[in-house]
């Protein structure tokens, strides 16, 4: 009788781990054998310097399977209380149309794509972003808009920085409307202090008393008041200062656009266009300005260019403004923005169209007017004369009773102070909401009837002089997709133009495009997480608190740091927040003169840009011929800095894809000269479970949760960049003016709009760590295995530029194409575009070394996919050989003409290579052909003929 397996034996082993890792055990053994080693442990010993090795398991709970992790997180979600939150302050209830929820937010074809640096395979989301810009331009009344910033508060800080760059006024003072949202004022204080600006927060009526280079006005303001800004804007222009206006997209459907009032910059949050509040984010900020300020504008701008056939094609325009090119001279350190959320907001506008959007705005405004009329009839004193959706009341001694009735009804109001209350209505409110509010403010037996009020004459709250008369959203895209069938097909059409992780490996170096597992994504749309206002009382967010506390504890265990600050909502924001903590630390010790930041020449562009934002002076440290930090140059630069040395920013493993043997000495040199070590966490995926930043010598580091910890890139955001700090820096990280966070100095101002940044995507990283547990080290090991496998397989055709100990690379490698360019004229761009014909997204081009490709396979790609990439690259090398031999002309070959489109093969073919060679160069391409939507995009034409709005594309055909 055969013995059947026991129940214990039938339990799934490493249930999630084996789903997350691409190569199975047999494939891993084959890869190890190719590298000449027997085990992963042997490879790690050869690769990771022994001085930094963490020779023990991570102190994390045992891994849960997917169902157990979801059940546990569901329990946390159930602890969050879903009250009706009318707190406002830039966050409002909204309805995400189901067709967008299911086909965009929950669709890996949208959320797993990368920032559209390769526009030929990103035309779908580029079109959605262009729609976002058109939406912003139309509603703000300005000439030019960007494709999103991180949140309203940081957008306001970017507006202040732009004003200083372009204003002719000589003042160093920036004025802030006292009735801006408090979180915005706090972020402005942080940025102004670092820049050395004087910030004046005062009543708008007092603006004339101040000489300024710019001002931020809120329209409608945080109290709900709507005032005519023209006199204030004229006064600002009279002293050659810029007028910046924070506004609300829904209100602008009914209000005169700020651009028509004379504003120079308009910004705000697009959250209420279909994006859940999510306890603070992620949300896309909009930002618009005048055409003349285009080169001073922060963030991504999508422009219309043309492709090699002369057809319209979209691309990211004016990239020379940005950190990845201009580094310390960049306008901003913005890298990751909020593309996925900007796309949701733009698609919300596409689906509803101008008439339905106006109806939604009118309904919100009508509800507010009825509430105002009812409370006025009962003698309540309203403090704002005009309004769109927000009312503020002086309630005096009645406040306690009102709040008690509100709690009984599970309604959150905004407590302004001990005598004033405010509330903001939104798309989710209805007549029943008003009935509840009448009872809350007036008690039982108030005698008001909503239907009766609605039948009478009620003032609408918007002054006649500020009622909108100009048209908006007239472009066909906003008037063609209003049935669900049409919208569904439009979304599919856009998605089909793009290449995302659900189709192929995206081997972008320094980007960690790993699996974003479905089980990790499921919780973000649970209403218990999605619907919470960021400023609800702590007890209503108990589930969030437990989840965040647990995630912070796990991140401490992984990194070795003593404290975590969750506020930064991108990696670049994390850099900025960490550098500010260092700056505050030095100031607390009387070392305010310490302002020099040492940065290796190989660093990410965000590093010098963030250092400049933190009021530091950047000094570059050279690298040696092997790509390591030149220790002699570091010692020299540190000694020269002396008591002005603030810190060193260093990425580990380095951006050259190696574990530097001297990292311990590097940290020691900086500490010996009184500096702090900031470790850029971009490459943390090669450290987890193998080494810890704090043990290596870092004092502070950010963690890209959208890289190492599985938050998807969303086509260019969202991201999260929490920072870990050692104990001595913990008091100096960001706090928040509305919800104080335990630990940091309560007087510290904020770096982002909400206390825990983009809190609603934190469940993704929680799920990943919960399901991996101590086996997170396996992910790091397989990432290193895959990178070395690729490096060694490709090295004969494309030399690997840098290697570390025992000729190993870390989790990524740099392929040197410069010799081929010199011999054949084929560039790294030609190879990148040709990979599209094989069905691949290109590796990172020309970073950190011009003329190279940086490849990072991650742990999630199977050996079959790695081999497919190798075969594509080797095939491309053979094609280059045909150019080299003269078989193909130097300027007319599949590489120079790549990528190839349907338009190429359906027209007259007059090229020295076959159609099959062009479009089906591999077996995979023959079986699963991905067609780029456009031919190679003309970047120069796009910048010289900048156009960043939706115009009928026929207008761009010559």
Swiss-Prot record:
GO terms for molecular function: glycine binding; glycine dehydrogenase (decarboxylating) activity; pyridoxal phosphate binding. It catalyses: N(6)-[(R)-lipoyl]-L-lysyl-[glycine-cleavage complex H protein] + glycine + H(+) = N(6)-[(R)-S(8)-aminomethyldihydrolipoyl]-L-lysyl-[glycine-cleavage complex H protein] + CO2. It holds the Pfam family GDC-P. GO terms for cellular component: cytosol; glycine cleavage complex. Its cofactor is pyridoxal 5'-phosphate. NCBIfam families: gcvP (TIGR00461). The glycine cleavage system catalyzes the degradation of glycine. The P protein binds the alpha-amino group of glycine through its pyridoxal phosphate cofactor; CO(2) is released and the remaining methylamine moiety is then transferred to the lipoamide cofactor of the H protein. This is Glycine dehydrogenase (decarboxylating) 2. It comes from Pseudomonas aeruginosa (strain ATCC 15692 / DSM 22644 / CIP 104116 / JCM 14847 / LMG 12228 / 1C / PRS 101 / PAO1). The lineage of its organism: Bacteria, Pseudomonadati, Pseudomonadota, Gammaproteobacteria, Pseudomonadales.
